[in-house]
Amino acid sequence: WKQEDLFDVANTIANQMNFEITNNNVVNTVTNFKGSYAGRLSVTKDIDTIKTISNPSIDNSSVYNYETKKYTKIYDYDKLKSLDKYDIYLSGASSIIDIVNPTSNSNRELIVFRDSYGSSLVPLLIEGYKKITVVDIRYVSSRILNNYIKFKDQDVLFMYSILTINNSFS
């Protein structure tokens, strides 16, 4: 789920959900690294690359994390020091976050139910929404979601890897 390879996916979702993604994106190479399993494998030459996508909507949006009660940017560059460099996207796995886009021309809201694979795709959808609530039901019971989300007229997107769906108990 490399972000720079997800433009077609993001555009397909945008088309189905009736909004457009402009093409004013800039691809930034953030880091080169060996993946988290590199130390356990005999592979020594393969370098992975993390790239982020910038545009005015992404750059001006903020992420509120209900667990930490803190705001961050879409890309958390401090996570590049962690074991899982892919946590740069939306600060990694969290039960519930809100993404607020102050530059949106729309009042639309989106609720995304996702696993960690959605972290790199969700930022590409920011342009179409004023607010995106991202829920990872691996970390929060669906029974208490109405304590955090007022379900009314939002678009909803379910985005899970097949492993998460096949092994889910929630």
Which role does the model predict for each range below?
Residues 1-170:
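Extracellular glycan-modifying ectodomains
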